[in-house]
Amino acid sequence: MCTNYAQSFAQLTTLDYNILTTNNLINMSEKKIMVIGSSNTDMTVVADRLPVPGETVLGGKFAMGPGGKGANQAVAAQRLGGNVSFICKVGKDIFGENAIRHYNNEGMDTTGIMLSEQPSGVALISVDTHAENCIVVASGANGDITEADIESHRKEIEAASILLLQLEIPVEAVVRAAKIGHEAGVYVVLNPAPACDLPEEIYQYLSLIIPNQTEIALMTGIEARDEEGAAKAVEALRGKRVQDVIVTMGSKGSMVYHQGQATFVPSKKVNAVDTTAAGDTYCGGLCVALSEGKDIIEAARFATAASALTVQKRGAQDSIPYRKDIIL
């Protein structure tokens, strides 16, 4: 419950909420990108190395800011030129209040944000000096998103051109959103993170799925350490009726599988300091490029350029670049 947090937001009125969620859209694309997913407050500490189980290590710098895979991807798409609507659920606490104000300031449509009696989601992130990270998430309000909540936004989903989903909210809600989008002819994109067992039903609703190497191995049972392994794993996924697949492969780049053809898009060589939001920036950037009419290979190159900038800065949303920063 929200009693452990700031009381001012716990007494939020309808008028206050409407003011908070009044959108201020500034974008380059008229096609709507609908993002449905998580909203967290990230608490990040930097250490020389990540602890092993049972070990305590001393950290260095600490930072707190907005995060969550859904929110990160929505912010990335907005900053990179997209026309974004974001549907999420936050608690009636100071974290929720700050999140709504932040998303509104980013310029996205925030009228789909819902309030929960659960506390807002929180992510505890540890990052080492080699830019590797580990994350533990307390879902809070994110876990309170129901199929009924998704149904209440059916018209908005059906009006979108692209629907971008992740797995930090209940999978039943994700499946319902994907089905609504698919049946309305919306281009449905799933980033299956964090990795989990997916119901077979969802695959038929997807236009594109974007797993990393760990996620595709969990979904198919096939390791994707290199291009050959990725190709075998993708074939297994395509057998589930997914149209297109992009496997992100960290600093190596990504493999794009489209209409039976595989294309490798290499990453730019940069000095990475924090990979926390790299995948989210990639997904958001890819959807922006697709909404602007670029083909999937061009879109992957744009997404790669955006994520290359992200890993050069610390933090989640603090590291996400703007359109003017992208150099192809």
Residue spans of the language-model regions?
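Glycine-rich phosphate/adenosyl-contacting loop at the front of the ribokinase-like
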Residues: 1-3, 14-89, 94-100, 105, ...
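Conserved phosphate-binding/catalytic region of the ribokinase-like
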Residues: 17, 23-33, 196-201, 227-328
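Conserved N-terminal subdomain of the carbohydrate kinase-like
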Residues: 53-57, 64, 79-161, 327-328
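Short beta-strand scaffold segments in enzyme catalytic cores
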Residues: 75, 122-126, 253-256
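Gly/Ala-rich phosphate-binding loop of Rossmann-like dinucleotide-binding domains
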Residues: 78, 182, 291
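A short, aliphatic-rich alpha-helical micro-motif
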Residues: 156-158, 203-204, 239
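Conserved beta-alpha-beta core of the PfkB/ribokinase-like small-molecule kinase fold
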Residues: 162-232, 252-254
